[in-house]
Amino acid sequence: MNRFLTLLFIFFAICTDISAQEAEMEQHLFDTMRDGDKAAVVAIHIGAEDADAKQNIEKFNAMLRKAYPTIDFREAWTSRILIQQVHSNGGGNIPTTDELFSQLNKDGYTHLLIQSSNIVNSTDMQILRYEVDAAKETFKQIRLGEPLLTDETDYEEVLKATAAAYGSEKEANVLMCEGTHGSENAQYALLDYILKVQDYKSWFVATSGGYPSLSSLVKQLKKQKVKKVHLIPFLFTAGSKATSAIAHEWAQQLQRAGYKVTTELHNLSDVDAIIDIFENHLRHAEMFHRYSPKELKMMTR
């Protein structure tokens, strides 16, 4: 990346409160274990609303199990609505993060290594950080891996992998993202900027309910005199139901604007290189202890 883009990334990192900026020291998690200690690897997801979404989640979970085959595996969801749907359909009881932490503590676990399937440092991710920091009083060691898009290299590798897997040379490629009115929109705006700086011709980013918006996308398409658009779900845990609903709505609006639209049927969970980035973040969390704001404050007293 050029110097300007690096400075821009730092600015976005500050605005979105990306905790990768915190101090850390090398300390392998499992090397800190003593006789009688118990460890678990934990996957955190928003949840799954259909069978396809469950398969996407399982690909992520399989990565964690394969990375640490001798360590107990556990899973929690953050959406109580999706948890209730599964329970109502006879799919068993899936704990929330707090419920899982409480149960692991009761079961004698002392060391937790956690990775979520969040794409950006969203509100959900920030809540998870708070829950993990609060649980540090309960466990001897608890580590949390970063979301998919965290540092400069992540953005470059994710775009490279997505383009290789789903890019179309004959159409304008549009990454469909789940934006909100929160700070995570800044990360999608940065993603869009990096596409342009890295010379990804005819590639665009748009979000549902956030920025860059679909209306801003149409303005860009008109400037480049685009006629055909290829929609690519920049999603991970979403199943076919949710993906189809978003794609259908976008396709209708783009068609009304005069564009021919095709839609990619797969998402990021089907790209091995994306799964590898999540694993890299998990292994980094295992190898490095990151000081929380509370720990840093105590160290400076």
Regions found by a protein language model. Name each.
Residues F4-I14:
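Sec-dependent N-terminal signal peptides
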Residues Q21-R301:
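Active-site-proximal alpha-helix that buttresses catalytic centers in soluble enzyme cores
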Residues T16-A20:
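Sec/Tat signal peptide C-region and signal peptidase I cleavage site
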